[in-house]
Amino acid sequence: MGCPAVEARRWGDMWLVVAFCLLGHGHAAVTKEEKAHLRSQVLEMFDHAYGNYMQHAYPADELMPLTCRGRIRGQEPSRGDVDDALGKFSLTLIDTLDTLVVLNKTKEFEDAVRKVITDVNLDNDIVVSVFETNIRVLGGLLGGHSVAIMLKENGDGMQWYNDELLHMAKELGYKLLPAFNTTSGLPYPRINLKFGIRRPEARTGTETDTCTACAGTMILEFAALSRFTGISVFEEHARKALDFLWDKRQRSSNLVGVTINIHTGDWVRKDSGVGAGIDSYYEYLLKAYVLLGDDSYLERFNTHYDAIMRYISQPPLLLDVHIHKPMLTARTWMDSLLAFFPGLQVLKGDIRPAIETHEMLYQVIKKHNFLPEAFTTDFRVHWAQHPLRPEFAESTYFLYKATGDPYYLEVGKTLIDNLNKYARVPCGFAAVKDVRTGSHEDRMDSFFLAEMFKYLYLLFSEREDLIFDIEDYIFTTEAHLLPLSLSTANPSSTKKNTTTQYTELDDSNFDWSCPNTQILFRNDPMYAQNIREPLKNVVDKNCPRSPSRLDEISGSGKMPPLRARDFMASNSEHLEILKKMGVSLIHLKDGRVQLVQHANQAASSIDAEDGLRFMQEMIELSSQQQKEQQLPPRAVQIVSHPFYGRVVLTAGPAQFGMDLSKHLAGAQGLVARAEPYSGCSDITNGQAIQGKIALMQRGQCMFAEKARNVQKAGAIGGIVIDDNEGSSSDTAPLFQMAGDGKSTDDVTIPMLFLFSKEGNIILDAIREYQQVEVLLSDKAKDRDLESESGEQKPVENDSQKQALEDLFMTPEEIAELLIVHEEESPVSQPEVPSSDSPSGGDRTSERDITPESQEHKTEETEHSPKDNVQTPPENSEDSTEEKMDNKVQPMESILADWKEDIEAFEMMEKDEL
């Protein structure tokens, strides 16, 4: 259920945006005692994560929290470009240095610095990301040096310190400099720490493209290194890269693209937004002005910010557009990295849109527990992963600092509760593989310790709780601390670019200092709440749609020339009507057609209105069909000893039987193998499966028949395991089990489908432990799930915590039983099946650093070996474009740009904040 969409129009193109309901509620203030309790809770969570890294992973780069071991590059299966952050230099330890001081753990900080000095080697024969190494390692060393000299000067320790971290930072800076050896001055995306660039042994240097954020997020760290050491070459190179990006902006829109050729300066990806691929470029322009005092950085930022608010911002949404056609949106989904932007707007002083976007993001979090990697404009999951990103916590902290509104303390409390409830595991905190099912990924990125706990601790801290004045520092994109005093220390010899022309802007909108908060808030404590109120139901959309121009047309008695429900792509008369309304059809390579409207191509303004109404009807019809035909994935959670809910398998749903989404308790019981294993005839071991969940093998009969047979024998649920040996949700679309063409109302038990790899997890557990109990549910339940015998209780003190950890499986057992789970199917603009549309499309895999599995769920009905598969209409333009050639098609420019949509996340990890 939800609010129907209402329309928004810009000349030349039309699209739909979401309506917002005016309904809100108040909140209670957080007391000082509660803040202290929450602050202590953050410290305990940090100790849990950091302690497990040091105990189980150090000196490895990162902790694998599910298997309780370190992630060492080359010893684990490659995850693609995400592994380029790992350089065998104890990444997590370096990234955490200044966090230790912020959290007042100075003794642990001294120990960590000594370990970095004695143990870390930066001269490894390994190819790393220039961007990630800069923000995480160079930034971590500089942040550690900054707080080390502060502690030494204040007499709070570190008296032995003699700039060792700075010397290491300088060594690393020189190792990164060869990356800038391009005709443009933009850095190569990767470099070999030992051999540099373009040597045979370097194994890198052939790349031609980089993301805007990758090239434009160097100035803070490199300038700080120059100011600390007096060596100007670092700041000069970073400044040259920024100058080049500024010069290559699209002059009419003042926007930059996502990906650029490092040799020619041509834009490879011409879409623009504030999320993945661009985000920290904007951030570093403004922060470079704050740190270095160079007015040109502020002028550039203001020019870009004006373009962002003019074209990209559609409060509370931030939608990507095309740099050469900024009135045309590039996609209908948003990525999670844009969550940093409200915090940047606070630094800019533009509070209202920051509050609006932050509230929208919070509503998404309240629905899914975490912010999915990407979500659509109607707030459905687009990519379901959540690698414990800190951007939303960052913006929450800055909004609280700007407004003092206790509401943001409640938001922070929600983040703490969700992390403990859904991400905490015995060996740290695990990334969420799928926010819908709660399944985990064996991953705890270094930025989780570098940023998340820093922002949460500061959110609940009073000034007296900190051992230094945090206002004397600026945060890098990785939340490392650089002192503002650097603006007067060893200024770079780089000359200011005096030839650059800046766009004339309204001075009233871009004061040289942040706007006066008294003017913004007018002493009104309800200011922020009044902005949030209209957005309270932005996700839970249960309000009526406001009358619109289209409603007036439909109520005027005028008969529309064509209704969406009547449209047939093979009807030439219908196609002629669409052409008159400015609606064109694009035939996709998988046999489907996609509708696009250009209002300026309509025969008249009335025809354009008819076309807009038709497009709205088609979107609503498509959405209705998706809801009817597609079910979200379900979860099979092993809850018996020694698993206790920590192994979650993503399962395909059935279109019949118990609806697990309406039965929150799910179905829990021991599992037993049915005989015959196919489940296609009367069950011969009825006593063995009575009151249990029956395991069956796919094939030989319809799914509904299997369900009826085990239900008749007394089973309380059923799991069908794929008979295709080696199949996995990693490599195959997730099935929906359909009925047999007859009424399935007689089936009342829940039925789920597992691929062979996931099913073998349960079968192996039965062989090992005999009695295996599972929970069938719509999503994974809390990891502190109590077993029937009550072995496991919530952790309330250290002794209970230790007792609990003793009950969990050993790392070896976890390693054997760990699996990878399926991703979310994208949702996008309406597409209608043509008369010759195939029943399904090919699966196209993506690199592992992105939400890699953009498969479409298919409905399975028939028997093995080749089951009949019913495929609902595809609903993702992005997945469609994945199947197209990589070359730009000589078609409408919008189609040429659409093919790039799915590539946006290929740079996701490279612009991590």
From Swiss-Prot:
Q: Where is the active site?
A: E132, D279, E373, E391
Asked if the record carries the keyword Signal, the reply is yes
Q: Where would I find glycosylation on this chain?
A: N104, N181, N497, N797
The kind of enzyme this is, by top-level EC class, is hydrolase
Main localization (coarse): endoplasmic reticulum
Question: Which pathway, per its entry?
Answer: Protein modification; protein glycosylation
In which residue ranges is the amino acid composition biased (Low complexity)? 826-839
Bias class Basic and acidic residues marks the residues at: 843-866
CDD domains according to UniProt: PA_EDEM3_like
Tell me which domain of life the UniProt entry assigns to the organism this sequence originates from. Eukaryota
Q: Where is the PA domain?
A: 660-766
Task: Check the record and name the PROSITE patterns matching this protein.
Answer: ER_TARGET
Its family remark reads:
Belongs to the glycosyl hydrolase 47 family.
Q: What is this protein called?
A: ER degradation-enhancing alpha-mannosidase-like protein 3
Q: Which organism is it from?
A: Xenopus laevis (African clawed frog)
Taxon lineage? Eukaryota, Metazoa, Chordata, Craniata, Vertebrata
